[in-house]
């Protein structure tokens, strides 16, 4: 058996043909399998002679075996066949391919194991048994560098790096990384990952064995593994130890690969779950994207295999998903690609058809004409000349034939020219379909393009003003011509509504069939049960629903629609629906005119948040009437194309419900998108507020438009639509619920406002460029258009705007098109010369209205306050203070009822606002209302543009000037938003009162330019506090005391002239008695008075000069203070020796409370008077509380500071430094300050350059730890030298703003202090650099204070020491993890455990048991070590933890 060319001869071939292909199968190997095997070997560049010997077969397997697991089915079949041949050569008895694979696999693994044992490059053992190191070759380094330069950091870089560094040590790996050091960002990422892994290694291997005196190796640390603190010899020794060898090279390599995975992920931020196939994307392109992203995923091989088997199918588009699921779970990637090759857009299908045609033309096959006249001789397999498909002549093919084609022009169909010479413009070369005017009785022509009249042009989305009218004119003209009986050379279908499927009766060879007109189908196909055609046919396979379909192809079949027919190709097969494809409709002259142009609107891509999936919330029960109402709404929306049915595979759902419309019997559909909104990406609000009429420039012509069906006009991202799925249930579960999803922006979805605003704004930008002088305001779907055009020009601009919107199918309904005043817009009523607020009707309030009714009322009043002055809501808001339910009823007070009636009277008188005139000055005038609020109006001349009020009260006690300052800030912010600048402000007070208050309260942030208008009311309500004691005036020492238990209290005063008064009070507190004491002093004193108190509470209230309060006692004190000419208020601690304060303290304390006596306050005051010591010195030396020491300092007129600025937050971490340059004596001093401790380093530099700054930074980093550097954005700090030094040192560099205290406040303050120190010692120094060094020494080691009362030098050392102790303590705590805890709970006598010890205290322990944290008493637990020691020793060791 066999022939000379066979690899097996005689008996070997007989044995071969008895071996089964599969175990338990019937088919056996044949000679054809050997022939096929030889052909496959040629693909691998292997000779077929290798099959003739056993050694040759083993060589084949050495090449193919490593690819077996990941190889295709052909490769696995080839390996199996070679294994069978090898077993026959070796005389091994086998019965099937699986037996051969099993036996050959064992042999190959043994050989591989032997090879692995002998392969130890780059470490080689010499004859003496010593390990010799072979450095990595330059060729490998060159390959690595070239790969990084070409591939950057794509996923394929990682396996190449792993292959190039096989067996390398840490030294080699560092050489590889240094070779690509130009990639600084990537190297920094790798460095961070290596440092993290090294720290984790040190944490998990805390017991470091030092080097032994006898030459023993130390245990490698994390830095040793990274090769930074170890030598090549040590690395080799660790890798080749006899016992407990540590392969540092492999460990370090895994760290680097971990960092590379992070790099790859940063360069490929798309998650594998986000890779989804587009609706018209080719499956091959989708697979390429999928695998590129999957390579970047940090996952194991099993996980990636699961991704390939599940995610690849689940994320495909519905068409491919249905085909792939029909293939089953075991389908290979090749089978998937073959099955889905027909899925894609028109370009993909055209490319696929071209490739198929090229394949067919290139092959020598018989083409038999099975129906109709033959176009030429039958092509023979070989030895015949080619036939031209154009002229049917032999000797050439169609593409080399120069004569015109038989079918004429591809554009218009005329026979007298080609497409290149077609006179019609390129815009009309598109194939159009449904016409938009009705069709009369016309004669059928050969081609539709032969009609030459002007009406044959395609209706496109024009931007001209006549667009909307142009369509109706064409319709009317076409109808008139049709009625006139004018003949046309072309043929067109009538108009078909897309609210339902376009199905038409079709005659096919005399058989009538109802078929779907499908412009997306390439071919015409009918179900074999509906029609039987006669004649010859050809077999064909096409891609259909559920997979490939085997159909019969009939040529030259006559198809007739509405009396108009043509000949074409028809397919007959098992299709679920009969379809008329483009091949027939094109011959009939079908045109597709897109009356709905929403496909021109750009799609905004939307995604879910990373790591989440869509909502799956069940639909709750609905009543029958709601279900019926919802179904009607959904049917209408589906007809309009705004929603569509959902595939059965969609498992997302969002619940819906229905409510009745106001005063109607119709239902309104609502959908609960709360869960989907949580899962969806965040959107930025494009418009932060509504436009205001006061900011509109006065114009002659106004028009207000509204975009109809605003959200429903903008398409939703097709990839996101499945997440909006919802279900309309049926009553009693009579049938499965109908499932829909949104095709447009849904109401209630978080992204709808942002996407709608952005989409419409991009379209309106065209109009704004064409009409720069026109004011076009857009807020959601409301449009305001104002201009100074003439009436005709303005109307023309409006027509152009509406036509522009229509190009994107954004309609502006006539019923909301406002041409004449008054114009209703955004709640306002607009006129050409004025604007109003739409009439505000206040509802009648009952005696006990609900919280919700009060809230609505306050909202209406606040809306009206922008134009109606004097509106107050303070008393109404008091009714709903606290956490009340919106349905809870409240009782109207007399004040609230009065406020309500006053507001009603104000609203009864209509108010008008004016538009902004850029040529006139804009100013704001403030007034104080009787209710205490601040009202204001924006004015130009005598005209009011708008009004407002300010009643915000942050504290219980406030004054008018503080409230006035807050009002000016509010007005300034609103003015910038509306007009873009801050106008001049007229405040109702005098300059003296304002500056007197402002002197004490300068830190209230920003105040604009003001103009003072004296108002007697505000002057009368103001009172002055003197900063110094009044000479010759009686001094009142006041005090109060109360008993916490009995609530009894006393308050009184004693004067320096011997007068005294003490009153008793019931049910009072200590703070109230202090206030009563001040009140008594004000009642009995004259117009000028000195008051001394020991109450910080009283001073804190009265020092801010409040004029309004809800506190009854404070209110009385304010009224008494207004009647005084001058008041001096001071604070002194209530202790012995301080004036008459001690005496009044004894009077009011008698029988009330026990007075504490502190002897150190008086000496502290004396010391401060002598040396002006700071607070820290007083607290340290005299052991005073911080509050007392601070008050002693602030009571000194020389040390007192008027107010303190509002401070921000400064990063005071341990490693944070601030650096700045200052100038003194025409020289440059660079100053560095440690933010946390205040430690300073300074020196004189020759030039303020990046090089000198970098040198200073390096010297600083060599002495002190730095993790973060903060500077201003000066050129020396932003230079390349400083950035490089920060990168090398691993320092984070941040920038601030020069001279901004919030940016470099610490170093700016030190600059000033350093200069003061230098000034004191400058006379003792010859050179400035010596003075700088001495001043730095004094600051760091001779100035005590701040945190801990230490010097700056002591403080920074203490902080570093504390940080090290903390880290040591954390390490000690981690040792607790070595202990296990067994414990009992409650009355349960059974021991539970073991748990993990987290903390051990004196009476209890904290442990973790089964993911739960427990606190157990020490008497109910036993703690043992986790490793082998006796119970006794374990207990002893435990107590030492």
Swiss-Prot record:
> Which InterPro entries does the entry mention?
Aspartic_peptidase_AS (IPR001969), DNA/RNA_pol_sf (IPR043502), Gag_p24_C (IPR045345), Integrase-like_N (IPR017856), Integrase_C_dom_sf_retrovir (IPR036862), Integrase_C_retrovir (IPR001037), Integrase_cat-core (IPR001584), Integrase_Zn-bd_dom_N (IPR003308)
Which segments constitute the Reverse transcriptase domain?
640-830
Q: How is the cofactor bound?
A: Binds 2 magnesium ions for reverse transcriptase polymerase activity. Binds 2 magnesium ions for ribonuclease H (RNase H) activity. Substrate-binding is a precondition for magnesium binding.
Catalysed reactions, as listed in the record? Specific for a P1 residue that is hydrophobic, and P1' variable, but often Pro; Endohydrolysis of RNA in RNA/DNA hybrids. Three different cleavage modes: 1. sequence-specific internal cleavage of RNA. Human immunodeficiency virus type 1 and Moloney murine leukemia virus enzymes prefer to cleave the RNA strand one nucleotide away from the RNA-DNA junction. 2. RNA 5'-end directed cleavage 13-19 nucleotides from the RNA end. 3. DNA 3'-end directed cleavage 15-20 nucleotides away from the primer terminus; 3'-end directed exonucleolytic cleavage of viral RNA-DNA hybrid; DNA(n) + a 2'-deoxyribonucleoside 5'-triphosphate = DNA(n+1) + diphosphate
Q: Which residues does Mg(2+) 2 bind? A: 1039, 1074, 1094, 1145
Name recorded for this polypeptide:
Gag-Pol polyprotein
Annotated motif Nuclear localization signal: location in the chain?
A: 26-32
Question: Gene encoding this chain?
Answer: gag-pol
Record's comment on post-translational modification? Specific enzymatic cleavages by the viral protease yield mature proteins. The protease is released by autocatalytic cleavage. The polyprotein is cleaved during and after budding, this process is termed maturation. Proteolytic cleavage of p66 RT removes the RNase H domain to yield the p51 RT subunit. Capsid protein p24 is phosphorylated.
Return any one Pfam family short name: Gag_p17
Q: Which cofactor does it need?
A: Mg(2+)
What SMART domains would the database entry show?
Answer: ZnF_C2HC
| Molecular function as annotated in GO | aspartic-type endopeptidase activity; DNA binding; DNA-directed DNA polymerase activity; exoribonuclease H activity; RNA stem-loop binding; RNA-directed DNA polymerase activity; RNA-DNA hybrid ribonuclease activity; structural molecule activity
Any known activators or inhibitors?
A: The viral protease is inhibited by many synthetic protease inhibitors (PIs), such as amprenavir, atazanavir, indinavir, loprinavir, nelfinavir, ritonavir and saquinavir. RT can be inhibited either by nucleoside RT inhibitors (NRTIs) or by non nucleoside RT inhibitors (NNRTIs). NRTIs act as chain terminators, whereas NNRTIs inhibit DNA polymerization by binding a small hydrophobic pocket near the RT active site and inducing an allosteric change in this region.
Compositionally biased region (Basic and acidic residues): 467-480
Function as written in the Swiss-Prot or TrEMBL entry: Gag-Pol polyprotein and Gag polyprotein may regulate their own translation, by the binding genomic RNA in the 5'-UTR. At low concentration, Gag-Pol and Gag would promote translation, whereas at high concentration, the polyproteins encapsidate genomic RNA and then shut off translation. Matrix protein p17 has two main functions: in infected cell, it targets Gag and Gag-pol polyproteins to the plasma membrane via a multipartite membrane-binding signal, that includes its myristointegration complex. The myristoylation signal and the NLS exert conflicting influences its subcellular localization. The key regulation of these motifs might be phosphorylation of a portion of MA molecules on the C-terminal tyrosine at the time of virus maturation, by virion-associated cellular tyrosine kinase. Implicated in the release from host cell mediated by Vpu.
User: Mind listing the GO biological process terms from this record?
Assistant: DNA integration; DNA recombination; establishment of integrated proviral latency; proteolysis; symbiont entry into host cell; symbiont-mediated suppression of host gene expression; viral genome integration into host DNA; viral penetration into host nucleus
**Site annotation Essential for RT p66/p51 heterodimerization: residues:** 997
Q: Where are the zinc fingers (CCHC-type)?
A: 386-403, 407-424
> Where does the secretion signal sit in this chain?
none
Query: Entry's Gene3D superfamilies?
Result: 1.10.10.200, 1.10.1200.30, 3.30.70.270, Acid Proteases, HIV Type 1 Reverse Transcriptase, subunit A, domain 1, Human Immunodeficiency Virus Type 1 Capsid Protein, Immunodeficiency lentiviruses, gag gene matrix protein p17, Integrase, C-terminal domain superfamily, retroviral
**PROSITE patterns (UniProt xref):** ASP_PROT_RETROV (PS50175), ASP_PROTEASE (PS00141), INTEGRASE (PS50994), INTEGRASE_DBD (PS51027), RNASE_H_1 (PS50879), RT_POL (PS50878), ZF_CCHC (PS50158), ZF_INTEGRASE (PS50876)
Q: Where is the RNase H type-1 domain?
A: 1030-1153
Report the residue ranges that make up the Integrase catalytic domain in this protein: 1210-1360
């Amino acid at each position: 058996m066999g022939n000379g060319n066979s690899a097996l001869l005689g008996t070997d071939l007989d044995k071969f043909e008895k071996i089964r292909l599969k175990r338990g199968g019937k088919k056996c190997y044949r000679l054809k399998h050997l022939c096929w095997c030889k052909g496959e070997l040629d693909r691998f560049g292997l000779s077929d002679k290798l099959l003739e010997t056993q050694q040759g077969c083993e060589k084949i397997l050495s090449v193919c075996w490593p690819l077996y697991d990941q190889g295709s089915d052909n490769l696995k079949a080839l390996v199996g066949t070679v294994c069978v041949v090898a077993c026959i050569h070796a005389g091994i008895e086998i019965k099937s391919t699986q037996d051969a694979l099993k036996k050959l696999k064992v042999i190959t693994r043994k050989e591989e194991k032997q090879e692995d044992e002998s392969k130890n490059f780059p470490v080689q053992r010499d004859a003496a048994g010593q390990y010799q190191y072979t450095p990595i070759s330059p060729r490998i380094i060159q390959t690595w560098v070239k790969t990084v330069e070409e591939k950057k950091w794509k996923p394929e870089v990682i396996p190449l790096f792993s292959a190039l560094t096989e067996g390398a040590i840490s030294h080699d790996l560092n050489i590889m990384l240094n070779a690509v050091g130009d990639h600084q960002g990537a190297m920094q990422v790798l460095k961070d990952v290596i440092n993290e892994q090294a720290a984790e290694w040190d944490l998990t291997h805390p017991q470091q064995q030092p080097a032994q005196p006898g030459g023993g190796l130390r245990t490698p640390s994390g830095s040793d593994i990274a090769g930074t603190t170890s030598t090549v010899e040590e690395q080799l020794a660790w890798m080749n130890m006899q016992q407990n060898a540590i392969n540092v090279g492999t460990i370090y390599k895994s760290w680097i690969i971990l960092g590379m995975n992070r790099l790859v992920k940063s360069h490929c931020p798309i998650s594998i779950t986000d890779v989804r196939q587009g609706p018209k994307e080719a499956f091959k392109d989708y697979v390429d994207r999928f695998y590129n992203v999957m390579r970047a995923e940090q996952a194991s091989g099993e996980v990636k295999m699961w991704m390939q088997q599940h995610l690849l199918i689940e994320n495909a588009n519905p068409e491919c998903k249905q085909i792939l699921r029909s293939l089953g779970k075991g389908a290979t990637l090749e089978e998937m690609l073959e099955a889905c090759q027909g899925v894609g857009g028109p370009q993909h299908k055209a490319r696929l058809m071209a490739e198929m045609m090229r394949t067919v033309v290139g092959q020598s096959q018989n083409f038999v004409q099975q129906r109709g006249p033959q176009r030429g001789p039958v092509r023979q397999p070989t030895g015949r000349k080619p036939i031209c498909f154009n002229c049917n002549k032999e000797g050439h093919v169609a593409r080399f034939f120069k004569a015109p084609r038989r079918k004429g022009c591809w554009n218009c169909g005329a026979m007298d020219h080609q497409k290149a010479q077609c006179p019609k413009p390129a815009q009309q070369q598109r194939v159009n379909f449904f016409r938009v005017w009705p069709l009369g009785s016309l004669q059928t022509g050969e081609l539709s393009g032969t009609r030459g009249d002007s009406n044959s042009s395609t209706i496109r989305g024009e931007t001209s003003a006549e667009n909307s009218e142009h369509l109706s004119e064409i319709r009317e003209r076409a109808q008139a011509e049709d009625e006139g009986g004018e003949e046309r050379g072309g043929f067109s279908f009538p108009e078909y509504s897309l609210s339902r499927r376009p199905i038409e009766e079709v005659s096919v060879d005399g058989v009538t069939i109802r078929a779907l007109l499908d412009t997306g189908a390439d071919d015409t196909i009918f179900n074999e049960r509906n029609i039987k055609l006669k004649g010859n046919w050809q077999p064909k396979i096409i891609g259909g629903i559920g997979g490939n379909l085997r159909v019969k192809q009939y040529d030259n079949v006559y198809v007739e629609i509405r009396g108009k027919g043509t000949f074409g190709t028809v397919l007959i097969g098992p299709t679920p629906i009969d379809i008329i494809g483009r091949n027939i409709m094109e011959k009939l002259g079908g045109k597709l005119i897109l009356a709905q142009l929403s496909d021109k609107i750009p799609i905004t891509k939307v995604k879910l948040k990373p790591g989440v999936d869509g909502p799956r919330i069940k639909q709750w029960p609905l009543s029958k009437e709601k279900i019926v109402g919802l179904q009607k709404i959904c049917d209408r929306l589906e007809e309009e194309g705004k929603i569509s049915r959902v595939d059965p595979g969609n498992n997302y759902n969002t619940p819906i419900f229905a409510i009745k419309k106001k005063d109607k019997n119709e239902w309104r559909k609502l959908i609960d998108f709360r869960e989907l909104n949580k899962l969806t990406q965040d959107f930025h609000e494009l418009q932060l507020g509504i436009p205001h009429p006061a900011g509109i420039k006065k114009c002659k012509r106004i028009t207000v438009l509204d975009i109809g069906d605003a959200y429903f006009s903008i398409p939703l991202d097709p990839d996101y639509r499945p997440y909006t799925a919802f279900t309309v249930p049926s009553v009693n579960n009579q049938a499965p619920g109908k499932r829909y999803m949104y095709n447009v922006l849904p109401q209630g979805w978080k992204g709808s406002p942002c996407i709608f605003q952005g989409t419409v704004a991009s379209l309106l930008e065209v109009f704004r460029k064409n009409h720069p002088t026109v004011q076009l305001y857009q807020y959601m779907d409301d449009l305001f258009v104002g201009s100074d055009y003439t009436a005709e020009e303005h109307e023309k601009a409006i027509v152009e705007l509406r036509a522009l919107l229509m190009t994107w199918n954004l309609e502006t309904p006539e019923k909301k098109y406002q041409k004449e005043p008054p114009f209703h817009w955004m709640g306002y009523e607009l006129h050409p010369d004025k604007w109003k607020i739409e009439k505000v009707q206040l509802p009648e309030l009952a005696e006990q209205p609900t919280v919700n009714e009060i809230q609505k009322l306050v909202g209406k009043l606040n809306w009206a306050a922008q134009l109606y002055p004097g509106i107050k809501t303070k008393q109404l808001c008091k009714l709903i203070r606290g956490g009340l339910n919106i349905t809870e009823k409240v009782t109207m007070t007399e004040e609230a009822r009065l406020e309500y009636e006053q507001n009603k009277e104000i609203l009864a008188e209509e108010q008008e606002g004016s538009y902004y005139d850029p040529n006139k000055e804009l100013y704001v005038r403030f007034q104080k209302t009787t209710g205490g609020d601040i009202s204001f109006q924006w004015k130009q001349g005598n005209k009011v543009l708008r009004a407002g009020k300010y009643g915000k009260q942050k504290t219980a006690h406030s004054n008018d000037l503080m409230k006035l300052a807050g009002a000016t800030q509010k007005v300034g912010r609103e003015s910038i938003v509306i007009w873009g600048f801050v106008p001049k402000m007229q405040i109702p007070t005098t300059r003296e009162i304002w500056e007197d208050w402002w002197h004490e309260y300068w830190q209230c942030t920003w105040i604009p330019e003001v103009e003072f208008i004296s108002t007697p009311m505000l002057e009368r309500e103001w009172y002055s506090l003197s900063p110094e004691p009044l000479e010759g005036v009686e001094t009142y020492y006041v005090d109060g005391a109360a008993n916490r238990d009995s609530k009894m209290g006393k308050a009184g005063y004693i004067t320096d002239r011997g007068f005294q008064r003490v009153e008793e009070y019931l049910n009072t507190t200590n703070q109230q008695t202090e206030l009563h004491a001040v009140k008594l002093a004000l009642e009995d004193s004259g117009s000028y008075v000195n008051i001394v108190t020991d109450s910080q509470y009283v001073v804190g209230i009265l020092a801010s000069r409040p004029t309004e309060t809800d506190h009854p006692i404070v209110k009385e004190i304010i009224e008494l203070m207004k009647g005084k000419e001058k008041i001096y208020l001071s604070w002194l601690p209530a202790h012995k020796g301080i004036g008459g304060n001690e005496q009044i303290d004894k009077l009011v304390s008698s029988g009330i409370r026990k007075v504490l006596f502190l002897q150190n306050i008086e000496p502290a005051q004396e010391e401060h008077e002598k040396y002006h010591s700071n607070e820290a010195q007083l607290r340290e030396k005299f052991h005073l509380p911080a509050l007392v020491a601070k008050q002693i300092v602030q009571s000194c007129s020389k040390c007192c500071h008027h107010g303190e600025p509002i401070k921000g937050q400064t990063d005071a971490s341990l490693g944070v430094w601030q650096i700045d340059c200052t100038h003194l004596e025409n020289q440059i001093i660079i100053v560095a300050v440690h933010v946390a401790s205040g430690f300073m380093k300074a020196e004189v530099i020759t030039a303020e350059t990046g090089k000198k700054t970098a040198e200073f930074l390096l010297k600083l980093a060599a002495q002190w730890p730095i993790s973060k550097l903060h500077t201003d954005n000066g050129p020396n700090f932003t230079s390349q030298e400083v950035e490089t030094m920060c990168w090398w040192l691993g320092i984070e560099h941040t920038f601030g703003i020069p001279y901004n205290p919030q940016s470099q406040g610490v170093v700016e303050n030190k600059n000033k202090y350093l200069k003061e120190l230098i000034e004191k010692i400058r006379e003792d120094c010859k050179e400035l650099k010596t003075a700088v060094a001495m001043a730095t020494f004094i600051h760091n080691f001779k100035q005590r204070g701040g945190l801990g009362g230490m010097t700056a030098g002591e403080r920074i050392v203490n902080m570093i020491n504390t940080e090290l102790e903390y880290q040591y303590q954390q390490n000690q705590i981690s040792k607790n993890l070595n202990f296990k805890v067994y414990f009992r709970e409650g009355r349960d006598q059974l021991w539970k455990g073991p748990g993990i010890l987290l903390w051990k205290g004196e009476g209890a322990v904290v442990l973790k048991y089964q993911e739960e944290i427990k606190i157990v008493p020490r008497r109910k637990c036993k703690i043992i070590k986790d490793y082998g020691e006796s119970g006794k020793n374990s207990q002893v060791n435990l107590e030492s933890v």
